[in-house]
Amino acid sequence: GLLVIARAAEGGMRDALSIADQCIAFCGNKVSARDIYGVLGGMDSSFLFTTADALINGDAALAVRSLDSVIEQGRDMGVFAADMAKHFRALLIAKLCGRSEDILSCTPDTMARYIEQASRCGETRLRSAVDALMDAVSGMRYLSLPRVRLESAFIRIASPDKAAEADA
């Protein structure tokens, strides 16, 4: 739980204390990582791994359904898009550097999951996924239909060969 708070605070002690106070106010004295993600509006890591699996396996439909689930839960699509961008960045770092808990500020178990998931995807595809998600994050702020931007990014990530054909 503390690692999640520290990551969300991005090194700011006051921000970390504020997040911790919010979590205690909403959840009481026993606060789990899932509770913290809920307070912050983000998704827990298992949901991100599942959505990334769908994208890596070429299942755009499942990834779009994941986005629909985020919306139904009242979560912020922008936060979800940013979380997915961070997740694919972690996969790219895992692919390039191997064990890199220090760079990613993650536990050894999470690092092992990143390495396993990254092993099923090429470096170029991971870079393209990070780029597509970062474009979606930046573009979503200015669109009246931000959902379409993120769905389009998911479809491009899930079907890289079809996206390349369309660009040709």
Model-derived regions: residue spans:
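Extended, largely alpha-helical regulatory/partner-binding modules appended to the mid-to-C-terminal parts
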Residues: G1-D167
